[in-house]
């Protein structure tokens, strides 16, 4: 029957197993209560009888009473000793329970049929026969087993799966006395019940009656589990080698304990020693494999003399229980001391590696993260052909540090040298692609700009900031207004913009434009006054009008941020647009013959921040997509 429970069980089977064990514990409890009641009835009958034959009966009664009194005294002393050691033992029990209850089904496989429910739980022999009185130990006091049946039933389940001792087996069974001394089981084990009594059944009932305290009574499940064939095959306690027989059992169970508690030492820990690592470090020797093995070894010398003394019966129960408590305290002592020290030095090499790998580099990465990220991502915009639009959100914070022209994007005026360097840098990356632009007529009536102009977006914030600073109303200005304003404003300065550099080298005129014509909308000036003047030199370049126009408008774009918004008043974007009538002339590339005034239409947009960013990001496609009027 029990083999069904020995492999790892599903939750439902675990619950069923708990119920079965609880009901078995209740049966054992009832059995013991019945025995105790029978004993009381016999005592009452014996008192009622006047005498069973004179001196014989009196002597017999005196002997019984002496034995009962001695047993009661021994039990009281043991209980007192145990009560003193209770807090530490209960704490240690909680730690071990928390540790060992993690794996539910493994112990039965290791220790053989250790939960011997099937052996003799239902036997109904006399009170002193070993099969029946293994249930009759004081371990089955009401509070204990009923508590197991009740709220703390899971604890009972786990307790039955711990490495178990014979501490709950009956004092009446001859073989169990040495076993109780031998096995460091639960912390109710220090019941040295029949340790001092010569007869196996001498103190069974009186002692049980004396020891039926409310706590420290082991669970009946331990007694049931300890009826396994391994412990039961040992010789009786009276035999001279009882102590020697206790030792192998002790070694076996403590080895079981060590093996179970240390099992997780090499396994990877999912957490680098955080909140949930704490209790596990406290309660298990598993985290301290070096300590685990010597601790039971060092405790065993203290335990073995007491075993031998128990075998020869001279040990007093108080001393025995004291030895028990001390040995278990010594075994449990390293555990409370260890938790503070556990995090700092990793105990096992595997664990140290794990903690270092997960925890310490995490901290270093946290400290290094921001500078590392900044250093890693700064270079790409500085490489020549690289598009700056890969990281638009970062424009403003790093603008001034990255390129010279970003100083204007932040609203500050850079030096002409910086502007020159930035312009030539971006232009050189685009010069190779300029000739690849088809010179056919543009698809839409807009000024044609080369498609691959990604480095322009860095100027996106410039008109944005200028437009926001200008704060004028958002509206479309008619072509007439723009013509009038720009004609009035730009005529005197337009030639100065044309003079400095010839068209075929686009970088030169645009460099001059940035600071030579800073106060004006050089786009407007180019469109209104000097289409002829600009296109004359630029005619040799394929798509001359489109290229020079686009490079002029883009080269001038930083000037928007600083000066054009001031002179312009509305701070919008000014886009030159070819009317359909002039499309053929401008698209054909014969810039010199293009009509000057009415063919060029400007639409000045007071656009939102997002719209301007989009327009400036896609310089060529933006007009076609968004602002065709």
Curated annotation (Swiss-Prot):
Q: Where is the composition biased (Low complexity)?
A: 105-150, 316-335, 525-535, 547-568
Superkingdom of origin: Eukaryota
Q: Which UniProt keywords apply?
A: Coiled coil, Methylation, Phosphoprotein, Wnt signaling pathway
Q: What span is annotated as the signal peptide, if there is one?
A: none
User: Where is composition skewed (Acidic residues) in this entry?
Assistant: 56-69
> In what ranges is there compositional bias, type Gly residues?
536-546
GO cellular component: a single term: cytoplasm
Q: Write out the ranges of the annotated region (Disordered).
A: 50-76, 105-574
Q: Which residues carry this modification: Omega-N-methylarginine?
A: 258
Composition bias type Basic and acidic residues, residue spans = 301-311
Q: Which residues form a coiled coil?
A: 63-87
Which processes are annotated in GO (biological process)? canonical Wnt signaling pathway; epithelial to mesenchymal transition; negative regulation of canonical Wnt signaling pathway; negative regulation of cell growth; negative regulation of epithelial to mesenchymal transition; negative regulation of Wnt signaling pathway
Q: Name one Pfam family in it.
A: Dapper
User: Molecular function (GO) terms listed?
Assistant: delta-catenin binding; identical protein binding; protein kinase A binding; protein kinase C binding
Query: Which residues get modified to Phosphoserine?
Result: 6, 165, 239, 426, 478
Q: Where is this motif: PDZ-binding?
A: 626-629
Q: Report whether Ion transport shows up as a keyword of the record.
A: no
Q: Spans of biased composition, class Pro residues?
A: 336-348
The UniProt family comment states:
Belongs to the dapper family.
Job description of the protein? May be involved in regulation of intracellular signaling pathways during development. Specifically thought to play a role in canonical and/or non-canonical Wnt signaling pathways through interaction with DSH (Dishevelled) family proteins.
Quaternary structure and partners: Can form homodimers and heterodimers with DACT1 or DACT3. Interacts with CSNK1D, PKA catalytic subunit, PKC-type kinase, DVL1, DVL3, VANGL1, VANGL2 and CTNND1. Interacts with DVL2.
Quoted from the entry, the domain comment is: The C-terminal PDZ-binding motif may mediate interaction with the PDZ domains of DSH (Dishevelled) family proteins.
Q: What protein does this entry describe?
A: Dapper homolog 3
Species whose genome carries this gene = Homo sapiens
Which gene is the coding source of this polypeptide chain? DACT3
């Amino acid at each position: 029957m029990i083999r069904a429970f020995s492999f790892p069980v599903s939750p439902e089977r675990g619950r069923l197993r708990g119920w079965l064990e609880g009901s078995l514990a209740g049966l054992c409890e009832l059995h013991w209560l019945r025995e105790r009641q029978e004993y009381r009835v016999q005592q009452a009958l014996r008192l009622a009888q006047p005498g069973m034959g004179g001196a014989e009966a009196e002597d017999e009664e005196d002997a019984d009473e002496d034995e009962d009194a001695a047993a009661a005294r021994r039990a009281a002393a043991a209980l007192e000793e145990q009560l003193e050691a209770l807090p530490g033992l209960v704490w240690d029990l909680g730690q071990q329970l928390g540790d060992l209850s993690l794996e539910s089904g493994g112990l039965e496989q290791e220790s053989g049929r250790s939960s011997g429910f099937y052996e003799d739980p239902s036997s109904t022999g006399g009170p002193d026969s070993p099969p029946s009185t293994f249930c009759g130990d004081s371990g089955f006091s009401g509070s204990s087993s009923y508590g197991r049946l009740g709220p703390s039933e899971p604890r009972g389940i786990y307790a039955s799966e711990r490495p178990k001792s014979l501490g709950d087996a009956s004092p009446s069974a001859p073989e169990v006395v040495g076993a109780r001394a031998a096995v460091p089981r639960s912390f109710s084990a220090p019941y040295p019940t029949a340790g001092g009594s010569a007869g196996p059944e001498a103190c069974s009932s009186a002692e049980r009656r004396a020891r039926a305290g409310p706590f420290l009574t082991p669970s009946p499940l331990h007694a049931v589990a300890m009826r396994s064939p391994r412990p039961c095959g040992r010789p009786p306690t009276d035999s001279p080698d009882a102590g020697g027989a206790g030792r192998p059992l002790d070694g076996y169970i403590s080895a079981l304990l060590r093996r179970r508690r240390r099992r997780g030492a090499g396994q990877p820990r999912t957490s680098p020693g955080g909140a949930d690592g704490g209790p596990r470090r406290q309660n298990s020797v598993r985290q301290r494999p070096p300590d685990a093995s010597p601790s039971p070894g060092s405790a065993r010398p203290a335990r073995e003399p007491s075993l031998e003394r128990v075998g020869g019966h001279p040990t007093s129960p108080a001393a025995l229980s004291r030895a028990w408590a001390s040995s278990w305290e010594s075994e449990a002592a390293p555990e409370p001391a260890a938790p503070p020290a556990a995090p700092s030095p990793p105990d096992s090499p595997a664990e140290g590696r794990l903690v270092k790998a997960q925890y310490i580099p995490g901290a270093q990465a946290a400290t290094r993260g921001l500078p590392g990220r900044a250093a890693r991502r700064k270079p790409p915009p500085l490489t020549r052909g690289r598009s700056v639009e890969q990281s638009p959100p970062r424009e403003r914070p790093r603008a001034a540090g990255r390129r010279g022209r970003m100083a204007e994007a932040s609203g500050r005026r850079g030096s002409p040298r910086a502007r020159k360097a930035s312009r030539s840098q971006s232009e050189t990356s685009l010069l190779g692609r300029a000739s690849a632009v088809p010179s056919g007529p543009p698809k839409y009536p807009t000024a044609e700009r080369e498609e691959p102009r990604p480095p322009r977006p860095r100027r996106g914030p410039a008109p944005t900031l200028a437009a926001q600073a200008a704060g004028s109303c958002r509206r479309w200005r008619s072509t007439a207004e723009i013509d009038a304003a720009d004609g009035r404003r730009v005529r005197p300065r337009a030639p100065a913009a044309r003079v400095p550099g010839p068209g075929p080298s686009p970088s030169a005129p645009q460099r001059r434009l940035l600071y030579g014509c800073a106060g004006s909308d050089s786009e407007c000036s180019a469109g209104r006054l000097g289409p002829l003047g600009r296109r004359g030199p630029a005619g040799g370049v394929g798509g001359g009008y489109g290229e020079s126009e686009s490079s002029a408008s883009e080269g001038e774009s930083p000037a928007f941020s600083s000066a054009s918004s001031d002179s312009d008043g509305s701070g919008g974007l000014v886009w030159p647009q070819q009317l359909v009538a002039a499309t053929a002339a401008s698209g054909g590339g014969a810039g010199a013959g293009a009509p000057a005034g009415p063919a060029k239409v400007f639409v000045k947009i007071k656009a939102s921040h997002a719209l301007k960013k989009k327009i400036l990001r896609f310089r060529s496609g933006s007009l076609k997509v968004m602002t065709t009027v």
